[in-house]
């Protein structure tokens, strides 16, 4: 999978404004409590209006649950491969891809400087507006406009990722990792792949 730089718990990054773990009840017929967020580089969003993706499909407001918030603590357009072990993940794949890590967010080295310098805004959203769209990816959707209840500024996204117990993996190119993960038994999300460097 190529050379990699691993940024672990001994990182020099210390300060960060991290989203508090507020819990809301998600009305999907279960009693599961989740936190609902939308991460943006825009600091002043007053209301999230339903929008169509690329002008097609149903207009929706998209949000992310707390467990997969880690996948969005990077610049919006940053290509990344994210993965973790699920119920069907084999012991071999767990050891090969994760080692002792709970989850991995992998980005290209070319994006690391932008990750270090970006400022993100984590909007807390009222969960009663949302239903689950994709449990593996942590996607939630609302068909009506949603006003955030609060917003946190994440001034150091690298520290925010690490504080969630996630391994941040920096690679020269993501293609080999992406291909291997897709063929594995891991749970994964591949995000903003159109922006990935060529093979």
Description of each model-found segment:
Residues 19, 24-27, 74-199:
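Conserved NAD+-utilizing ADP-ribose enzyme module
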Residues 38-44, 65, 125-130:
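Short, flexible beta-strand-to-coil junctions
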Residues 44-61, 133-149:
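Surface-exposed flexible segments
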Residues 1-3, 15:
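N-terminal cationic amphipathic segment used for targeting or macromolecule association
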Residues 12-58, 75-76:
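ADP-ribose/NAD+-binding catalytic cleft of ART/PARP-like enzymes
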Residues 32-35, 57-61, 67, 109, ...:
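Short, surface-exposed beta-edge/turn micro-motifs
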Residues 67, 71-74:
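Compact, glycine/acidic-enriched structural inserts
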